[in-house]
Amino acid sequence: MRALRAASIAVLAPLLCAQTVNLNDLLASMRKRIETADFRATGHLVWVQPSGVRLSYPITVKARWFPGVLREFVEMGAAARTPGNAPPGARLATHALLEMRPNGQSSISIAHPGDKSPTVLPVEKWSEGPLGPGFGYEDLLEQQYFWTGQASEGKARFGARDCIIVKSTPGPTDRSHYAQVKTWLDPSIGFPVYVEKTVKESGVVKEFTYYGIRHEEGVWSAHQVEVKVRGQSGSTLLILDRGSARANLTLADFSPAQLTKF
């Protein structure tokens, strides 16, 4: 019996170590993807109403990592027509400047046509977005990979992909309106295929599904991300049609002064 126990430990120990290393390697891969970002992409943010009617808004996203901070500049135009039940932000063009710092001190500023100066959003409004709470501003940051709380919840299959589920929880200094984020990561490419984000206090769960995952210019990306609020009808789609994974952006591309220029 003692020999059997020793043999079991000898077999299990490497497996447990491999799981730990695998999680660390996955997180390192995700962080590296963000810390080497330098892209520009254009496409549409699409609001799919419960009735199935779609409203499309042009969007441009550019992002680059600078020492200690990821900067993103988002430009969203107004739709050709806007129904009466549309969120207030959907009626106006929107500019947003997002800054993500690994120490948790991220920030989000937005502006609309006619604004003399941008508005710095408090954390409690990070769940909001141009089209309502489905796809919020914070969802563009992917800061969960830098949070202090990281744990593996084992393996799972999502569609045709074998994934490892990573549970990320913010620490006391991490600014976020999420209580936790669970990510289904494909370890063979180091890229998410599905994500569940739980909102603080309300417990609302938002589901993000990645479609059209591709490898271009040495970078993995998704052609489309669909966001659904669990238990609610309708969805929001972020569709990226074209762009460059090596855009050679500079600090001038992220000047706060650009927020009020429409």
Range-by-range predicted roles:
Residues 39-43, 59, 72-74, 106-108, ...:
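One face of beta-strands
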